[in-house]
């Protein structure tokens, strides 16, 4: 169990003036001196809790909480359409269903060419990723589940849309026109370009058509501003600088109920500071006025001959869109991952931001960025970007990935590291605390019981009622948890 130093107060908390700039869930933040810490109240201490599915302890949670796991792919899981459920459960969102149930639309981050899962016509007959949709009770009992998108690749995160759909993101730029990615597996057999976003209606089927004008890059997550009808997008370009983007549809999706493919993609730049290095450590409460630079060619197709290895390398292709923005002054970030919109603010995570500047543009073998996490907030109406948090100490925060907001404005962060993985809460008062600890053990290892403590959490999302937190274990043998209990009592 981690020490009290893990429950540190926010180092980059806003001052009173900064809070007024930000508003929203973090308007209550107050400045804390560097190094200030605070022990979480005793009722937040984590303890082993048995899974309602079978009595096994898979999570440590605060007192009074329960959970049920489902769709555990250590064993074969058949969906209602006959599909064998793939693993790599990743980003996810929850929507209202009938009879008090919840629709989950869940990503499966499967890479490399191969046969798609599920029925119907896939986007790419050699794409193994996609989404599944699950109707589930608030306490984690599955009513039905089916394939809702197939034939994609590396479906990482995404974001919920207020009209009732999920935008799923491909974290790759693979295709027949691009050389092999980090796995070394040839892309020659792929039939479509990848690196796009797709829309999936809750409880329904995706039309399997990519929204290409929203960019072909290593997409991670999206967050939608219903006031202006603008979609904000994060990029997780592992070995190179990443960008923060916005996509402005030609028609307001709040009126049409869907994203169109005729919009404009733009990249964030800092006013007066071309190519601002926001991946490196920033001053406390750093605040920037931003502008947006256009991406002229958001969905490139590179020259290739079918059936032959493409001359364009993966490293060349994966920076193509971002380089257009950086040529016009776009800002450098480190590995932008989860994003969430709340009350006029887009919150997003930089997984390796906050450390010393990188010595080169890349590729960087252990990832671009030398910190262990930054949390940024972008005020959409004021076009102001503010740093909420940064650290180089994994005992404070260790590589934040997916993020969601609770009904009370607390951020729930999924850690993605090679050691113990936690869900962390970040309150409006600026307190960072442990919310859940992975204590999963394999049931199929030899002998059984091998620890899987470094399997990451992903896809945290609250039910529409706010009573249940659904979250995934992202691993080749994935699963989903429904966690419920006295959230208000612990300030989540």
Where is each model-derived feature located?
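N-terminal secretory signal peptides and thylakoid transit peptides that target proteins
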Residues: 1-17
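Conserved small-residue
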Residues: 12-492
């Amino acid at each position: 169990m981690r020490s009290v130093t893990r429950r540190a107060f926010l180092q980059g908390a806003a001052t009173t003036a900064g809070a007024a700039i930000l508003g929203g869930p973090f308007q209550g933040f107050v400045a804390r001196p560097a190094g200030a810490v605070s022990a979480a109240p005793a009722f937040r201490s984590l303890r082993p809790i048995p899974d309602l599915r079978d009595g096994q302890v898979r999570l440590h949670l605060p007192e009074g909480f329960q959970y049920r796991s489902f769709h555990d792919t250590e064993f074969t899981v058949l969906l209602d359409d006959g599909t064998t459920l793939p693993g790599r459960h990743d980003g996810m969102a929850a929507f209202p269903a009938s009879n008090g149930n919840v629709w989950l639309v869940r990503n499966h981050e499967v890479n490399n060419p191969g046969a798609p899962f599920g029925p119907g016509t896939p986007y790419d007959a050699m794409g193994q990723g996609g989404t599944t949709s699950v109707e589930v009770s608030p306490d984690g009992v599955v009513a039905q589940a089916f394939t809702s998108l197939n034939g994609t690749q590396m479906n990482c995160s995404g974001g919920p849309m207020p009209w009732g759909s999920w935008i799923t993101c491909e974290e790759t730029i693979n295709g027949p026109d691009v050389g092999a990615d980090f796995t070394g597996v040839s892309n020659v057999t792929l039939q479509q370009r990848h690196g796009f976003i797709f829309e999936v209606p809750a409880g329904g089927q995706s039309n399997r058509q990519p929204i290409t004008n929203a960019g072909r890059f290593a997409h991670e997550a999206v967050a939608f501003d219903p006031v202006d009808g603008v979609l904000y997008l994060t990029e997780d370009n592992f070995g190179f600088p990443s960008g923060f983007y916005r996509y402005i549809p030609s028609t307001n999706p709040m009126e049409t109920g869907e994203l169109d493919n005729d919009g404009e993609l733009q990249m964030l730049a800092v006013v007066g500071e071309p190519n601002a290095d926001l991946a490196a450590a920033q001053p406390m409460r750093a605040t920037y006025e931003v502008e947006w630079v256009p991406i002229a060619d958001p969905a490139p197709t590179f020259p290739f001959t079918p059936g032959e290895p493409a001359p364009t390398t993966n490293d060349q292709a994966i920076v193509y869109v971002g380089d257009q923005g950086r040529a016009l002054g776009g800002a450098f970030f480190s590995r932008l991952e989860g994003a969430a919109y709340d009350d006029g603010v887009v919150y997003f995570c930089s997984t390796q931001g906050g450390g010393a500047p990188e010595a080169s543009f890349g590729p960087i073998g252990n990832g671009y960025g030398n910190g262990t996490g930054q949390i940024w907030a972008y005020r959409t109406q004021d076009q102001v970007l503010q740093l909420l948090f940064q650290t180089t100490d994994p005992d404070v925060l260790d590589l934040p990935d997916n993020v969601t907001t609770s009904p009370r404005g607390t951020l729930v962060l999924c850690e993605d590291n090679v050691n113990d993985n936690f869900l962390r809460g970040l309150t409006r008062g600026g307190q960072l605390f442990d919310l859940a600890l992975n204590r999963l053990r394999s049931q199929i290892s030899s002998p059984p019981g091998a620890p899987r403590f470094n399997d990451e959490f992903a896809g945290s999302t609250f039910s529409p009622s706010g009573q249940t937190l659904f979250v995934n274990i992202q691993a080749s043998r994935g699963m989903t948890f429904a966690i419920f209990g006295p959230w208000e009592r612990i300030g989540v």
